[in-house]
Amino acid sequence: MGPSTSPLVGCNGDRKVLQQPVKITLMEKWFPGDVAESTLDPAQAPLYQYTEGVDEANEGCPRAFVTLKAGVEEDALKYSFVGCCSNFDEVVSRMTKESWIELRNTRGQISSRASLRRKKGAVRAMKYILSTNVGEHVPKSSILRHWNEYLLILARNRDSSLPFRFSFGSKVRALPLSSLPSLAAH
């Protein structure tokens, strides 16, 4: 589409044709050419080193966070009594000053929330970590009673109307509760 033109009468009476500027999008401005026809200018592409650096950062960041979270969960296992006590005030009273400061510093590696600066906030955060780390409770045997206890733990942490998800290798399959006994028998 070419530039639009409009006649304009000059001060001495002659008609001049002025070209008005064409409106373009930012995509057209920064990436001239047509994406569909692959006529983009290669000079507009980012450098190879920049692209590689961004890819490495994008791949490394989730791995680093998972490693950090696993370390925090591992440190949380030292405070396993936090997860088993039902009375929150009892848990807070059992924590010594050194242990809750260590707990606060451990949790502070992945969160900078102000609530972790208090003893109750640190204990509440660790109780949450221990309740969401469901992998600790997965039965190692195929005894049905152990799997039923495991389902009770899951039901406390999740909506019981949803199907439970068990992972087999790299695939995750959703299983209804009715298929669990056949799974435990194998």
Curated annotation (Swiss-Prot):
Protein name, entry field: Uncharacterized 21 kDa protein in aldolase locus
Species, as recorded: Trypanosoma brucei brucei
Species classification: Eukaryota, Discoba, Euglenozoa, Kinetoplastea, Metakinetoplastina
